[in-house]
Amino acid sequence: MSQSLIVALDFPGKQDVEQFLRHFEGEELFVKVGMELFYKEGPAIITYLKEKGHKIFLDLKLHDIPNTVKSAMRSLASLDVDMVNVHAAGGSSMMKAAIEGLEEGKQEGKERPICIAVTQLTSTSETMMKKEIGIEKTLEEAVAHYAKLTKESGLDGVVCSTLEVPKLREVCGSEFVTVTPGIRLASDDVNDQVRVATPKRARELGSSYIVVGRSITKAENPLEAYKTVKQQWEGVTV
């Protein structure tokens, strides 16, 4: 299950990435490249990581009119990334357009990237969602609604918190992909995320993938931290 552990490369530039990856010589990781790193380094960072043998979740959370998202996804698919995402709030037409773009842009002989949708960010509390975003549903209801819409639009799954996974399994079935950020070791600070869980708890709740950032990237020994997270995620007793 180690390939379903995604390491968030939340760094400002390639130099920091190179320094971090020195801890992982010989390891083939599944890494997340977000806005900060991609906007700084561009497609070259994807090429660099692919040459190192890593799988890539390109986390740009696209949210625009359908035609723009379709064109953008066509370009992203040509980079040979393994996973991409959109905001479910963009609606069904936009999500369907995203899939069309990925199919058109995928490299010959390869499957299109996994495409998932963001339901609600893990920094969003129910109070914030109601007072600031203007959604009157409960957080669980809003996430379930977006997940159902995502599945109906032909996407593979959603980004959600671990707490929402059991409900989404009921609504969308066991094959629906759930990618869960907000993963922390029990000894770590929560920082700016509200809905968090440990790797062990994520496994128990049924997450398909977990995304782990600071617990690994800010650790004194990143490789040892990675192994600890991996063991908890895979249910290994040491």
From Swiss-Prot:
Top EC class, one word: lyase
Keywords: Decarboxylase, Lyase, Pyrimidine biosynthesis
NCBIfam families per UniProt: PRK00230.1 (NF001273), pyrF (TIGR01740)
Self-association and partners: Homodimer.
Catalysed conversion reaction: orotidine 5'-phosphate + H(+) = UMP + CO2
GO annotation (BP), single: 'de novo' UMP biosynthetic process
Record field: transmembrane: none
Pathway in which the depicted protein is active: Pyrimidine metabolism; UMP biosynthesis via de novo pathway; UMP from orotate: step 2/2
Pfam families: OMPdecase
SUPFAM superfamilies in alphabetical order: Ribulose-phoshate binding barrel
Annotated protein name in UniProt: Orotidine 5'-phosphate decarboxylase
Organism domain of life: Bacteria
Residues reported in the UniProt entry to bind substrate: 10, 32, 59-68, 122, 184, 193, 213-214
Assigned GO CC terms: cytosol
GO MF annotation terms: orotidine-5'-phosphate decarboxylase activity
Organism this protein belongs to: Bacillus cereus (strain AH820)
